[in-house]
């Protein structure tokens, strides 16, 4: 877990550098890492997920960002894909590489100013982040598409935080069906490796009981 904590410090450091260099101006922060750093989600993740919300010359932006990261870190991968800008880099001060993924398509989304912080770092970064309701919308789509148990963990977290569900009956049925397919080892390893011991033990024992209850309420409404 010490490795994951140090990685979190790395994430905050990078966000602070990006903000100070004005790279965050056209972007909004989202995804699991955003939920952890801005809303205290108790699951570790290793990527920074961002979305363009303003029109910029993306080719020029990508070139500038590559140069900036190369000057501060060891840049190991940089690709301008059709849908995303992908950059991966490492630092001798931290044990894991960090990946930044920026969605290129500009879509209407709900966001607000939040403070990204870590209990393991003194730095705090004020930035634009998805609202809980927008995060819920994104997570429902991701869970149905990827069927990744970590997305379902995030969904349960969002429901506990009071995020509006926006889950229709068809989606609720599909999500519930996917949950029944998760094996014991998926809870212990795939999900458990991203959780602290207490939270891991809870989910190995209780699975997604709360989420399933809420999905059933949605189907029966």
Describe each PLM feature range.
Residues 1-27, 38-40, 53-221:
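Structured mid-to-C-terminal alpha-helical surface segments
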Residues 29-33:
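Glycine-rich beta-strand-to-loop/alpha-helix junction loops that act as flexible
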């Amino acid at each position: 877990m010490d490795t994951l904590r140090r990685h979190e410090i790395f994430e905050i450091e990078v966000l602070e550098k990006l903000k100070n260099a004005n790279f965050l101006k056209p972007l909004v922060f989202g995804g699991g890492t955003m939920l952890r750093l801005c809303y205290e989600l108790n699951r570790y993740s290793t990527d920074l997920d961002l979305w363009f919300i303003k029109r910029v010359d993306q080719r020029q932006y990508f070139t500038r960002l590559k140069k900036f990261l190369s000057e501060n870190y060891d840049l190991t991968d940089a690709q301008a894909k059709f849908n995303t800008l992908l950059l991966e880099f490492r630092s001798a001060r931290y044990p894991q590489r960090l990946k930044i993924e920026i969605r290129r398509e500009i879509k209407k989304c709900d966001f607000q100013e939040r403070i990204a912080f870590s209990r393991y770092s003194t730095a705090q970064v004020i930035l634009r982040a998805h609202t809980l309701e927008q995060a819920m919308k994104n997570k429902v789509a991701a869970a149905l598409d990827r069927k990744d148990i970590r997305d379902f963990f995030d969904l349960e977290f969002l429901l506990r935080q009071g995020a509006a569900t926006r889950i229709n009956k068809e989606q609720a049925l599909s999500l519930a069906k996917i949950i029944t397919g998760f094996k014991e080892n998926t809870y212990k390893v795939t999900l458990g490796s991203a959780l602290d011991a207490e939270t891991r033990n809870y989910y190995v024992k209780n699975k997604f009981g709360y989420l399933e209850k809420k999905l059933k309420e949605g189907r029966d409404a």
